[in-house]
Amino acid sequence: MRIILLSGGSGKNLWPLSNGTRSKQFLRLLTAPDGGKESMLQRIVRQVEEAGLNVPITVATSQTQRDIVVNQLGNKVEVVTEPERRNTFPAIVLAASYLFFEKVCDPEESIVVMPCDSYTELSYYDCIKRMVKAIEANEAELMLMGIRPFDFSTDFGYIKTENSGGDFFRAVC
């Protein structure tokens, strides 16, 4: 199993603290276990380690944010840089291509793709472990984690599901 963290957004949601160069995921606003401050990116990597997911992490980011990622995480992760921002899907394709062609990963290896600016509890990673086990047991080829919406917004996509009798739901096509 490998993890791709998506960290290429412009992150203007916390303007003026964040901007096109310094996105919200790099701001050290969260309290770390040692009482110091950590960024969302640092928190996600720490939580992955605390959850026992001792797997390689690749961060997909923009060229302008590469140095910030390296500064905050050092050699804990590998960094893949997009020549220019092209949104989520191209970032995933670039990182997956890097893993396949440069790192020569097994094409059957599970890859977890997640944003680096999530604020989650450790139980989130238990769910990821269960999802990977389901993939490895050939229960599915692709899995997507989502939440039930409280109301609807045109900002998000929605998936119609049906209960498959287990921990997971199947998408209705």
Indicate where each model-derived feature is located:
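N-terminal glycine-rich phosphate-binding loop and ensuing alpha1 helix
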Residues: 1-69, 75-77, 81-86, 98, ...
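Intrinsic disorder/low-structure terminal segments
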Residues: 25, 167-168
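Glycine-rich, flexible loop segments associated with nucleotide phosphate handling
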Residues: 37-44, 107-111, 170
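Conserved beta-loop-beta/alpha segment of the NTase-like Rossmann-fold superfamily
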Residues: 74-167
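Polyanionic, low-complexity intrinsically disordered segments
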Residues: 159, 172-173
